[in-house]
């Protein structure tokens, strides 16, 4: 028989008693929890869960199925001991990704530099504006004669082009200065005159 002191009282009115299995919206049963019309099933189960969770957080030594799982150094439960976890399932999570002695630092620096160049090349490849410069490392090589053609392999020059090249040659350029009076001054005289006037100033 349900009694108030035992905590198993389901309702205060026997005439209005409805079995929990026939109540609309009933989703289950929590044993050991007093259920009544004043406290809906959702509120009761939420309070039961919060109480169990707070108790588990306070102890920090129960299994996860009972509301909390906190690994410790010393515990009565062997699945929570840090040493046991490190030897079983969590050994791959804490695997070091570094080496104690770096014996090939130059190779590591080379790989890091190559990775940075690859990222810059990726940015250049994805660029649509043409503002990102290309990385020379990833430019495909071409034949030497395509980049630096031999002069004998070029087509012959026309007389007009030959005359133009001879006219702009350094030995054919005018290096003298012509004054309005018609007098021409050589570069050597101009150099001496400039030194004199610079010294006088």
Curated annotation (Swiss-Prot):
Keyword terms: Cell projection, Cilium, Cytoplasm, Cytoskeleton, Flagellum
The keyword Transferase is assigned to this record: no
Subcellular location: Cytoplasm, Cytoskeleton, Cilium axoneme; Cytoplasm, Cytoskeleton, Flagellum axoneme
Gene field: CIMIP2C
PANTHER family membership: PROTEIN FAM166C, UPF0573 PROTEIN C2ORF70
Main location: cytoplasm
Function, in words: Microtubule inner protein (MIP) part of the dynein-decorated doublet microtubules (DMTs) in cilia axoneme, which is required for motile cilia beating. Binds to the intra-tubulin interfaces.
InterPro entries in alphabetical order: CIMIP2C, CMI2A-C-like_dom
A single GO BP: flagellated sperm motility
Subunit structure: Microtubule inner protein component of sperm flagellar doublet microtubules.
Cytoplasm as UniProt keyword: yes
Family stated for the protein in its record: Belongs to the CIMIP2 family.
Protein name: Ciliary microtubule inner protein 2C
Cellular component aspect of the GO annotation: axonemal A tubule inner sheath; axonemal microtubule; sperm flagellum
């Amino acid at each position: 028989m349900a009694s108030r002191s035992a905590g198993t009282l389901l309702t205060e009115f026997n005439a209005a008693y409805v079995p929990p299995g026939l109540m609309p919206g009933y989703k289950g049963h929590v044993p050991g929890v007093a259920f009544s019309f004043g406290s809906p099933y959702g509120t009761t189960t939420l309070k039961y869960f919060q109480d169990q969770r707070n108790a588990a957080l306070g102890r920090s030594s129960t299994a996860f199925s009972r509301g909390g799982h906190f690994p410790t150094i010393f515990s009565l439960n062997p699945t929570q001991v840090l040493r046991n976890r490190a030897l079983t399932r969590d050994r791959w999570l804490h695997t070091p990704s570094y080496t104690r002695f770096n014996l090939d630092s130059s190779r590591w620096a080379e790989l890091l530099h190559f990775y940075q160049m690859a990222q810059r090349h990726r940015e250049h490849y994805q660029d649509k504006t043409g503002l990102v410069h290309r990385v020379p490392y990833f430019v495909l090589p071409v034949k030497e004669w395509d980049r630096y053609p031999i002069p004998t392999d070029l087509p012959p020059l026309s007389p007009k082009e030959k005359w133009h090249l001879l006219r702009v040659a350094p030995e054919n350029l005018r290096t003298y200065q012509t004054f309005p009076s018609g007098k021409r001054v050589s570069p050597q005289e101009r150099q001496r005159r400039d030194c004199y006037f610079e010294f006088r100033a």
